Amino acid sequence: MKIIRTSTISISLNVLLKGQLKFLSGFFEVVGISSGDELLDEVSQREGIKTIGINMERGISPLKDVISLFKLYSIFRSEKPIIVHSITPKAGLLTMLAGKMAGIPIRMHTFTGLIFPTRKGLVQKVLINMDRLLCSAATNIYPEGQGVKNDLLNYKITSKPLKVIANGNVNGIDLNYFLPEKISVLQKDQLKKELNITASDFVFVFVGRLVGDKGINELVQAFSQISKNANRSKSVKLLLIGPLEEHLDPLQPETVQEIKNNPDILDLGFQKDVRPYFAVSDALVFPSYREGFPNVVMQAGAMGLPSIVSDINGCNEIIVEGQNGMIIPVKNSDKLKVAMEKILSDTDLYQKLKINSRPMIQSRYEQSVIWNELLKEYKTLLKENNIDV
């Protein structure tokens, strides 16, 4: 019995669904479809599944979208899956439409994050209608968390039932992988030496794409003021872990200049293994404008780091104010600065947040729980469609 999982770009299959595809392949024949590149090859080798490369544009591109749609349709007709299950917006729209055209009985889409709530005018209307079209072609719809579910309801995207798997998130956290003890003292000391981190440094870390939507402009502005404060009792550093995407939602020129010129800001680019950087850091700062259910906040928590996050979907579900982190308003560098200064100066609060961080991830987002709940959902849908498992 065959299941096809799709995403717009291969990094989503490679990172967001790491391990899950291999788990599912123990019960089904699993095929992964995304943009064809070395990351998709890595998915195939690591997960032990067949992969097929199809380029899908992330932005609105009608002609290229039609080409991708018919390529998917052709593959679905050839592969004959029982279930197609998509993540990410464009792959969701194209997969659901192609799946319906090809007569696939079970067409599932997981909304991992919504773009339209942060847009206005004509662009917002177009995005809303695209998601409505996606939902009309899907048989089953899964918001990644309660916040995403609420937005789908509030904007009347669909009247179909909406179900959150387990406690939310598409893949959960591998707590044996994101374990502080996995990074040795020697590894930490070597990395600190490379990055010139001293014992007196309080290290903030951000992990993600360096774009405006991730709140990087506000983060750099807030940190710049803190780092230049001559009266601070501790020195500070900010690690930026992630690619700079200049073609999509570029940073403000003054932000780019500050990143280049401030010696306390370390722009380290994309890192395949983020654990060592969590291990030498003291707190995650994640002031994103929109998310579905951000893995990085859970990963940081599993590594024992408290987080400062914006009050958005997912972030405000993972973080409980004053328990395992702090929640600040979106697009507010002043409030972000206050929160960073608070966590920097209030030792008792910081220790409380730090102690709670891993247990609060462990109790809610263990990976095996989410995988088994998804498997259970697949089997339920097959039974409802009178398909023998």
Range-by-range predicted roles:
Residues Q190-K193, K335, K342, L349-R364, ...:
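A short, well-ordered alpha-helix in the C-terminal region of glycosyltransferases
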